[in-house]
């Protein structure tokens, strides 16, 4: 299995270095649900601003304030403790009376707004996230500037970030032990983290191998192509390659890579043979995913940050702004820009 730091770069290995997250204010995340609160219902959506506290900690504190069970407070995604983040929590509080959430006090946390909503906010139920990052002590400004321009045009690999695999790769190591011993794992959280790490690592490996080709965006027979911004996909045939290539070049279609698991992967012929060969050595992880009935899926191979802009504060400090769809990692963007340093270089989302 390729180590995350050794995965293939789309724009070549960065020449410069920089400090990511010198302080929490250098990493700002604003959650985008993609919808507004209903204004009625048995749930309350609460938009919070937090700094220095993780999502679960705030959710538990909110439950205590509302005198409800912790399981009655949900969220669409975890946000990093070591960052300034805006996100929505959802509390189930039936009844017509609206609690005064402006009285909720927690160090490092502020309630920005709240409103009634009809449905529970479930994990993953968000459109995306807007990021504002500040990279400090940047070396080789010219190389970084050119990479910023290239990312606007060509995007970045849609790798799962190192944080998906746990501190020191602990989640992936857990998955490997599980696969090798077949010992039942009772802890539901561990099961989820380990299976997710296994599938994500296989996806990363397939993408890394594809990036070694001369033209990563060259459609091949049997590729599974996804409509940009959509989850649906279809299989490319030889008769359609020229037209499909035009649509990929126009970013209307995206080439996908497999999230291996049980069932068919989605590609056929040449593309399927390539994907299978890319992870042929990882028989234990593949067998684990099939055994645990994790359904195979597809994910876009490349990621095009939206609303992408940057501003150099001085020769060694640059602020970068962009929006990513849910499930994508800001660190996969930064990875193509600089070699990061700092205690939290890999801990982003």
Curated annotation (Swiss-Prot):
Membrane-spanning intervals of the chain: none
GO molecular function term, any single one: RNA binding
Gene3D superfamilies in the record: TruD, catalytic domain, TruD, insertion domain
SUPFAM superfamilies, sorted: Pseudouridine synthase (SSF55120)
A Pfam family: TruD
Catalytic site positions: 80 (nucleophile)
Gene Ontology cellular-component annotations: cytosol
Tagged with keyword Isomerase: yes
Signal sequence range: none
Disulfide bonds: none
The protein's enzyme class: isomerase
UniProt xrefs under InterPro entries: PsdUridine_synth_cat_dom_sf, PsdUridine_synth_TruD, PsdUridine_synth_TruD_CS, PsdUridine_synth_TruD_insert, TruD_catalytic, TruD_insert_sf, TruD_pseudoU_synthase
EC number: 5.4.99.27
Residues engaged in binding substrate: 27, 129, 329
Ranges for domain TRUD: 155-303
Top-rank lineage group of the source organism: Bacteria
Gene Ontology BP term (one): tRNA pseudouridine synthesis
Alphabetical keyword list: Isomerase, tRNA processing
Function text: Responsible for synthesis of pseudouridine from uracil-13 in transfer RNAs.
Family label: Belongs to the pseudouridine synthase TruD family.
Protein name according to UniProt: tRNA pseudouridine synthase D
Source species: Escherichia coli O8 (strain IAI1)
Designated gene of the protein: truD
